[in-house]
Regions:
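A conditional alpha-helix N-cap/helix-loop micro-motif detector
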Residues: 1, 25, 69-73
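N-terminal amphipathic alpha-helix/helix-capping segment at the start of soluble metabolic enzymes
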Residues: 1-18, 79-81
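Hydrophobic faces of well-ordered beta-strands that scaffold small-molecule active sites
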Residues: 14-18, 41-45, 89-93
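Short, acidic/polar
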Residues: 25-35
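Glycine-rich, proline-tolerant flexible connector loops at the mouths of alpha/beta enzymes
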Residues: 41-71
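Glycine/small-residue-rich loop that forms an oxyanion/phosphate-binding "nest" at active or ligand-binding sites
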Residues: 60-97
Length: 97
């Protein structure tokens, strides 16, 4: 939680977003590792979901393609084991009741 609090300390935070697994999990891992040298304070990682009603068309299409490639929550967290970053990571996930 310290990384998140520090991202907002005395300034506005720069937050990036990526749909995990788009276009592939390997690409996502490499991209996230490169972002460590960016101006971002925090990275929001979208966990793909088959019916992302709250997202716009671009994010929905990326999530749909990732899901079609077999990306799920467990595979995203397995991929993240290979990510080395000093940035705060937060997640966007869906939950149906």
């Amino acid at each position: 939680m310290d990384k998140i609090a520090n991202a907002f300390k005395d300034k506005k935070a720069n937050i990036g977003y990526i749909v995990a697994g788009y276009p592939s999990l390997e690409y996502s891992k490499e991209f996230l590792n490169l972002l460590d040298d960016s101006i971002l304070d925090m990275i929001e990682i979208g966990i793909p979901y088959s019916d992302p009603l709250a997202d716009g068309k671009l994010i929905a299409n990326a999530a749909f393609q990732a899901c079609n490639n077999g990306v799920n929550t467990a595979r995203v967290f397995d991929m993240l084991k290979g990510v080395k970053t000093s940035k705060a990571l937060v997640f966007l996930v869906y939950y149906n009741i």
